Amino acid sequence: MYLDPIAELITKINNGRKAHKAEVSFATSKLKTAILELLVKEGYIKSYDIRPTENNKSETVVKLKYKNQTTSSINGFKQISKPGLRIYSTHLNLPKVLNGLGIAIITTSKGVMSDKQARKENVGGEVIAYVW
């Protein structure tokens, strides 16, 4: 069990893509679901499914996306804001990942969104992770 749910999500996806797994699974939370929805929208993963488990808990199964048999759609997935050091940014100082080739995942007052969308809506927030 992880103390940081975002670290669990990133670690499971990174380990799954490096091992060329078709899917990975982990415990469900609202924040993880919002991040996965953004990753599907941006085209980094195929899909995700939430399955009930015992004890009224649920498990999320993520289907990873590959360009061909060996190359993952995600080249890198890095956590930025951590429980011991939160990183916040205004809409004017939102980071660009690889000059716009990747995305920064931002939690704002309007929900979880990419850095591009946050710039359009003029909102800042906590910079959770970079994906490229």
UniProtKB/Swiss-Prot annotation:
One GO biological process term: translation
Keyword Ribonucleoprotein: yes
Entry's Gene Ontology molecular function annotations: rRNA binding; structural constituent of ribosome
Keywords: Ribonucleoprotein, Ribosomal protein, RNA-binding, rRNA-binding
PROSITE patterns hit by this protein: RIBOSOMAL_S8
Any one GO cellular component localisation term in the record: ribonucleoprotein complex
Span of the signal peptide: none
Domain of life: Bacteria
InterPro entries per record: Ribosomal_uS8, Ribosomal_uS8_CS, Ribosomal_uS8_sf
Functional note: One of the primary rRNA binding proteins, it binds directly to 16S rRNA central domain where it helps coordinate assembly of the platform of the 30S subunit.
Quaternary structure (record): Part of the 30S ribosomal subunit. Contacts proteins S5 and S12.
Entry's family note: Belongs to the universal ribosomal protein uS8 family.
The protein's name: Small ribosomal subunit protein uS8
Organism phylogeny: Bacteria, Bacillati, Mycoplasmatota, Mycoplasmoidales, Mycoplasmoidaceae
